[in-house]
Swiss-Prot record:
Record's protein name: tRNA dimethylallyltransferase
Cofactor requirements of the protein: Mg(2+)
Keyword Magnesium: yes
Family affiliation: Belongs to the IPP transferase family.
Source organism: Parafrankia sp. (strain EAN1pec)
Keywords: ATP-binding, Magnesium, Nucleotide-binding, Transferase, tRNA processing
Enzyme Commission number(s) of this protein: 2.5.1.75
Gene, per the UniProt record: miaA
Region (Interaction with substrate tRNA): 53-56
Site feature: Interaction with substrate tRNA: 119, 140
Pfam families from the UniProt entry: IPPT (PF01715)
GO MF, one example: tRNA dimethylallyltransferase activity
Subunit structure: Monomer.
Amino acid sequence: MTASRDGAGLTNGATRADQAGPVIAVVGPTGAGKSDLAVEIALELGGEIVNADSMQLYRGMDIGTAKIPMVERRGVPHHLLDVWEITRAADVASYQADARRVVNGLLAAGRVPILVGGSGLYVRAVLDDLSFPGTDPAVRARLERELAEVGPGPLHERLTGLAPTAAAAILPGNGRRIVRALEVVELTGTFEATLPEYRSIYDVVQVGVDRPDLDTRIADRVELMWRAGFVDEVAALAEAGLRDGRTASRALGYAQVLAVLDGAMDSMDAAKQATTTATRRFARRQRSWFRRDPRISWLEFPDVAAALAEVRRLVGSL
């Protein structure tokens, strides 16, 4: 990893000279042990945790997202957990504003912000010089109605005519992404299919956590979810409107249990296996995303003492 010092000044009126200390990011695939390591770093450096897991933003989605229990936080403040209702659609632009406000506040108070999560876009939204188009509920609703009526094919053809590069990067069957791209084109006149270059707005140390036995860890974690009452959690959230949450209802595990409750899948055992398979697939995508970032220092076997020593070394190199 390289420690990032390039890029624009801080948001919300701050400048790089205002930054009192580093921002640390602990990233990597699901199930690798990021949350526990982040707590150790926070205790060592006087830090506070800022959540960068898009599903842990939702209230009540605790077991299935492996939200760190209060006792395991060991007194370390955790920010941006349980802040969204399950019926709210994910909004990275809103998250970016909230997270940067927390990060800048911690820096101003002399604390070390420790960003933790496996949602790669959310991590980059906080750390990098990125901006995101807004949304228009009326436009989105109209496009979603059209998607339900005619399917993704005609919408993808329209996108090809309006923004061919964007259309080429989106599978013709991915209705959700097609709708979002068309919404952005309608609101801004263009759509960027790829993210800009890596350019941090903070002094950043990024540490990646990975495991050679990740597939086994994921299977064990899913088994523990079921034993901990995950099915009951999903059933309770379903009563509270989970099915109406365009984002939350698609979360790993939650979508599979809902499928059983709605008669679209045969059994909870099938849902458990499907959750394990989907989570492993998702972890591979996460790994690929983060491995492309040359700024990340990877800890293949996350020994706490070695990890803390590496973080201290990287902070000292800023």
